[in-house]
Amino acid sequence: MSSIPVIELSSRAREIFQLVVESYLGSGLPVGSKTLARQGVNLSPASIRYVLQELETKGLLLSPHISAGRMPTELGLRLFVNGMMQLSEPSEEERSAIEADVIRGHSPKERLVNATTTLSGLSACAGLVLVPKQELVLKQLGFVVLDDNRALAIIVGSDGSVENRVIELSSGFPASALTEASNYINAHFSGYSFSEAKKRLFSQIDLERSELDSAASDLIKRGLAVWSEDSRKRPVLIVRGQSHLLQDASEDLDRAKQLLEELEDKKEIAGLLEKVSESDAAQIFIGSENKLFSLSGSSVIASPYHGEDGHMVGVVAVIGPTRLNYGRIVPMVDFTAKTLSRIIA
């Protein structure tokens, strides 16, 4: 979590500040002295107003209108999150829902999608999962003729994923060479990553060239080469629940539109979430603390999940307005990350 300047608060100011933040996060409305008095603050309204003014001077609160109450600034939210937030673990029902939906997936990607969708629904935020894409391990590869000059290379990965690429064929390319090439690849390279397969390919194919049709030999080389290094290592970002960001749009339509635009910049989001990989616990980015979401004034709560060997595999996160129930959502994101670590690993 981000560090903040040392801010000295009296016990009275600390109590009032915490009440203001908790009330604001619950209602989304500025908090005034009368509201605080009703919550049991044992001070006169005038004394409460004095403390509120003091907190505003320190940059922890602001007043959106002259006659309105106070609401926390980003600095105030950071102070609250770092030292005053009361964490509330997910309920048994919430934990069961997350675990059941992750287990229900038939492939790693489907499990990640399910986790993202469930987390989004429970938090009423947009849910994200970042997967630094691992090099694909070949299970099976086949070719399908599209027309006289093109074939579709279809690869099935060991994780159940399926990818397609179009390969150009020379005029009169024999259909038998497609079958011969796919049979050779599946017999010799199943269970290998593409970089490993390429190394084996050039050491083996010369020895066995006499047993292979020249067209099949050429197709084998291109069939393995078509999956480029860049495409294999491009991170995958799954986003679900964008509709939750529009629920309060009637109050702040411009902010919601801005956030939806920011969510389209998947490369920048991936860069932000990759920073989380250096930590074992949930990280919180509030408003302008991250450049990407500074215009919309949004918060990101993200936590890494790990593989069997303990290395970071990906990051799960939620994005929403800065007025989030941090105490509830932070443990929920952490639990989802731990569930993914346990089940997917």
UniProtKB/Swiss-Prot annotation:
Q: Which UniProt keywords apply?
A: Repressor, Stress response, Transcription, Transcription regulation
A molecular function (GO) held by this record is: DNA binding
Decide whether keyword Repressor is in the record: yes
Q: Which GO terms describe its biological process?
A: negative regulation of DNA-templated transcription
PANTHER family in the record, alphabetically? HEAT-INDUCIBLE TRANSCRIPTION REPRESSOR HRCA (PTHR34824:SF1)
Q: Which family does it belong to?
A: Belongs to the HrcA family.
**What role does it play?**
Negative regulator of class I heat shock genes (grpE-dnaK-dnaJ and groELS operons). Prevents heat-shock induction of these operons.
This protein's name: Heat-inducible transcription repressor HrcA
